[in-house]
Regions:
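Binuclear metal-dependent hydrolase catalytic cores
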Residues: 1-160
Length: 160
């Protein structure tokens, strides 16, 4: 198994625009960090954890091949804003999105053009083909050859 940390920065990335702190003013390349995301890969499976606004830039550095699933930890913009940029990966087939129900509902509200109601809207050309899958804490599920067990953690005061 290979885990690539695509981004380890804050919700604004590092450096933060307008910040004069030592880290943000640093010329050290280690102080230039994109927003949080990770790529988990085995010989046959590729999973993205969170898909923020830096997704496209992050993936330009990776081999272009199928993404078997995307795990979304929570609905914050810095974890979901790159979902529309999954479009090129849809040439391999629909992309499975895995999240808790509240996150799935937030995605439907924020990106209704990606998740049409069967009776009302239809996908128009160029929209990423995303399928929502609800996951539950402490219930193992499978993506490819990986078994995944979601756990609850604290994100400041919010449980995710």
């Amino acid at each position: 198994m290979k885990i690539t940390l695509l981004g380890t920065g804050t919700s604004q990335g590092v450096p933060v625009l307008g910040c004069d702190c030592e880290v943000c003013k640093s010329t050290d390349s280690h102080d230039k960090r994109l927003r949080t995301s990770a790529l988990v890969e085995t010989e046959s499976t590729r999973i993205l954890i969170d898909c923020g606004p830096d997704f496209r830039e992050q993936m330009l550095k990776q081999p272009f091949r199928k993404i078997d699933g995307v795990l979304i930890t929570h609905i914050h913009y810095d974890h979901v804003a790159g979902l529309d940029d999954l479009r090129p990966y849809c040439q391999f087939g629909d992309i499975e999105i895995y999240s808790e129900e509240d996150v799935a509902n937030g995605l439907k509200n924020n990106m209704p053009y990606c998740f049409p109601d069967d009776n009302e809207n239809k996908l128009y050309p160029g929209v990423p083909k995303l399928n929502l899958n609800t996951i539950h804490v402490h219930e193992t599920f499978k993506i490819g050859d990986l078994d995944i067990m979601p756990i609850r953690i604290k994100h400041d005061t919010m449980s995710i």
